[in-house]
Structure formats: structure tokens, C-alpha cells
Amino acid sequence: MKDWTGTGRAYADSYASLCVGTAEALLGAFGTPGKRTLLDVGSGTGMLTAAFADAGWVATGCEPEPTMRDVALREHPEIPVCDGTLPDLPFEDGQFDVVVANFVLNHVADPRASAAELLRVSVDLVSATIWTNSPTWLWREVCERAALIPATGERLPPEKDFERTVDGFARMLDDAGWPRPQVSEITWTWSADATALWASAEGGVGGAGQFYRALDDAGRRSFRAAFEFVCAERSIAGRLPLAHSAAVAVAPRG
């Protein structure tokens, strides 16, 4: 699986603003917050957790990567962030009204066990998202321009893997014991800053960042030149409009 070690600042400056694009759909699915509690599992640098808190939820983050937690606590000091990782969260059964994992189950070694763990600590609703059209397509285009062979990415063993579609996600969650998971697909356009995107590559964020760091000097120069070419070709008013799609799942606890 991807190594996120030390990527907190680079992630906060780049993909955090993309991943929070699910906030509206999730908030709409969760209903009125009242004084209900919410756990954001794999909360990263805290941008989505903060969106939940701003909407009135009593929100808590849970993030295993130390530099992610450091950024979250620095930028959102009013929101508690715990150290914890799937599929063994440090919480009691039914400790939170709502439990959500945003773009987490596509990164874990055992998606079904991890999904079951989300269900365990929820008392009301459980929710998760995955990419159906992910940020990797941009970097594949960069690799093609640079005449570099893109990394294929690590695949899970067949018995652990699942199809990254609405139906495939629903089947996996059903296998994990989620009662009546409702899965829909949303699409939005992320207006990305090219400088921040490049910082994510140099900072080792995700598969593209790890691929870039593994290149020799000549490969890095080719990759950078191809990135600048793609950005110049796709940019509108200095921003990159990049379409992405996600499957959003919500299920009642029982």
C-alpha cells in the first residue's frame, strides 16, 4: 500500500482541497447534527473534519500518520485528533453517532475488515467514499508525455480486492456486514493550482509522488517538463479544471 510517511504538509497544500469535495454530499446524507458525535477515520490534515465541525457536528479526527496529525492540530486546534488505524480503531463499540472514512478504504490492506470496523464503532450511521475516477489519470498523462512507464500501483490479493465502481463498492460493503448500504456516484471539477500539484509530487504524496521520488535525475527532469506541458495545455485562467468522480456509501447501523 502507499507510504504516506512525512507527507502532511505537501498533502495539506494539494490534495486536501480535492478530497473535501465530498463534504456536501456527506453532510446531506447525515441529516441534522444537533449534538451528535462524528468520527472522521483517516482524517488526514483535518479539512473535512473541520467542515463537519463547522456544520455543527461534534467531530473527532482519527489519523495514523504523525505529520498529518501535526498539520491538523496546528490548523484546527479546536478539533481533537486521535492516533489510530484500520482495522483496529482505539474506540469502544458504538462510541460515535456517525462514522465516516473519506477515500480510505481504497488504501487499506483489508477493505472488508476495515469497513466492518467502521460499523463497529458507529451507533447510528456509517459512511465511506472511494474514487471511481481518481487523481491518477493526470499523472498517467504526464508519464505518457515524458515517455516514462507509469507505476501500475499495488494490487490487493484477489480475495481482498473489490471493483472500484458503485456496484463493486456496494458488494464489498455488503460482504463486510453493512446493512442496506446505499451507494451513489458524484462528480465534481477540482480547480487545482499547478504549483500545489507539483509540491505534492516533490513531497511524495500518493502514487505519483512515490513514482517521482524513485526516478533518477534525468527522469525527474523529463517528468517535470511533461508536467509543465500538460498544465499549460489544460490550464484555464491559471488553474487546472480536473474532473473527478467518487462513490459515496451510507448505511444505517442496524
Identify what each model region corresponds to:
Residues 1-34, 47-51, 67-75:
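Conserved class I S-adenosyl-L-methionine
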Residues 100:
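A conserved beta-strand element that flanks and buttresses the S-adenosyl-L-methionine
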Residues 103-104:
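Short catalytic micro-motifs in class I SAM-dependent methyltransferases
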Residues 112, 123-193:
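Conserved catalytic/acceptor-binding region of the Class I
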Residues 35-37, 124:
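Nucleotide donor/acceptor-binding cores
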Residues 19, 45-47, 160-254:
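Conserved Class I S-adenosyl-L-methionine
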Residues 37-88:
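Class I SAM-dependent methyltransferase SAM/SAH-binding core
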Residues 108-117:
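A short, conserved alpha-helix within the catalytic core of class I
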